[in-house]
UniProtKB/Swiss-Prot annotation:
Belongs to the protein kinase superfamily. Ser/Thr protein kinase family. Expressed in leaf sheaths and roots. Expressed in shoots of young seedlings. PANTHER family: SERINE/THREONINE KINASE, SERINE_THREONINE-PROTEIN KINASE SAPK9. This is Serine/threonine-protein kinase SAPK9. ATP binds at I28, G29, S30, G31, N32, F33, G34, V35, A36, K51. It comes from Oryza sativa subsp. japonica (Rice). Keywords: Abscisic acid signaling pathway, ATP-binding, Cytoplasm, Kinase, Nucleotide-binding, Nucleus, Phosphoprotein, Serine/threonine-protein kinase, Transferase. Gene3D superfamilies: Phosphorylase Kinase, domain 1, Transferase(Phosphotransferase) domain 1. It is found in: Cytoplasm; Nucleus. Induction: Down-regulated by ABA in roots. Induced during incompatible interaction with the bacterial pathogen Xanthomonas oryzae pv. oryzicola. Residues 22-278 form the Protein kinase domain.
Amino acid sequence: MERAAAGPLGMEMPIMHDGDRYELVKEIGSGNFGVARLMRNRASGDLVAVKYIDRGEKIDENVQREIINHRSLRHPNIIRFKEVILTPTHLAIVMEYASGGELFERICSAGRFSEDEARFFFQQLISGVSYCHSMQVCHRDLKLENTLLDGSTAPRLKICDFGYSKSSVLHSQPKSTVGTPAYIAPEVLLKKEYDGKIADVWSCGVTLYVMLVGAYPFEDPEDPKNFRKTIQKILGVQYSIPDYVHISPECRDLITRIFVGNPASRITMPEIKNHPWFMKNIPADLMDDGMVSNQYEEPDQPMQNMNEIMQILAEATIPAAGTSGINQFLTDSLDLDDDMEDMDSDLDLDIESSGEIVYAM
C-alpha cells in the first residue's frame, strides 16, 4: 500500500540549531515542511524530534496555527509540544519523539491488522481526537502518516502534525478544502462551511478501514493516483469491504455509520465512544477522558509562554540573510485548482475552485 500522498524532497541545506541545548543524533525525515531531526537534550539526555522550517514566507498561518493549537493540547495520545527555537536560518519546533515510527509503516509491514489490533489503535485514536474536540480543536488532516507510535511493547498511539488544525475559539468555522484526498470527508469538498469535528470522524473511519483492509476505501486500486476518481467516489460514498476481509457485524455497523455523506446523519464522536464495538476490551485508562487528561498533567509545563512564542514567530517571518531562493521545493504537477473546476462542470457540483487540498508528507 502506498502513502495517500507524498510531496517531493527539498535540496540539502545546512541547518543551524541551538547547540547549547540540543545535539544532533540523526536525520529522521523531510518533506514540504522542511527537515526533521532527532536531537538529544544535552542536560537531560532526553530524545526529542525537531522540525525545521525555513525562515521567511514558509512561516505562514498554517505554521502559526500548528504551534498555537499544538501547545494547548496535553494528552497521552497526542505528541507533546515542547518549545520553538529561532535559528539564523530556520524556525525549529521541538516535540516529543515517538520511537515506534508511523502507524502507516506498521500496517505496510503487516498488510492489514486483525480486528482486535485495529480496535486497539482505533480506541487510542478516538481518545486523542475526542480530547482535541473537547479543547475546541479539530485536526482536519488525520491520517496514518500523522499517527505515530511510542516504543513500548503495546504501542501508544500519538497524533501529530496540527498544521491544518482549527480552533473554534481562535478561528471561524472551517471552509477551506484542506487535507489528504483519501481521507477527506465529502462536505469538505463543497463550497460551504462545515463542522470540522464531524469531518474528523470521517477521517478516523478511513483510518479504521485501512487498518482492517490494508487499502484506502475510496481509491481505485487499479488507478490509485487518479485523485479525481477518488474525489468522485468520496462524494458518492462508493466503497465496499472485500469478501476476504472478515469482520464482525458490530464493526461493519460502525464503519457504515461513519461513512455517511450527510454530516448531520453521521455518527458523532460521543456516539462512537458508546458503540458496542468500540467499547469491547477498552483499556481502563481510556474510559474517562477527564481522567486521561488529568493523569497527563506532567510537571514539565511548556517552556515558553504565548508572548514569547508569538515574538519568535514574528521574527521567524523575516527571511534569513542570503537564503533567498534557496531550498525551494517543487510543487506537485497536479493542478488542483483546475482539477476542482473541471469536476465542478463535470459533476455539476459546487466545488471550492480555490480549495487547497495539500499533499503533505
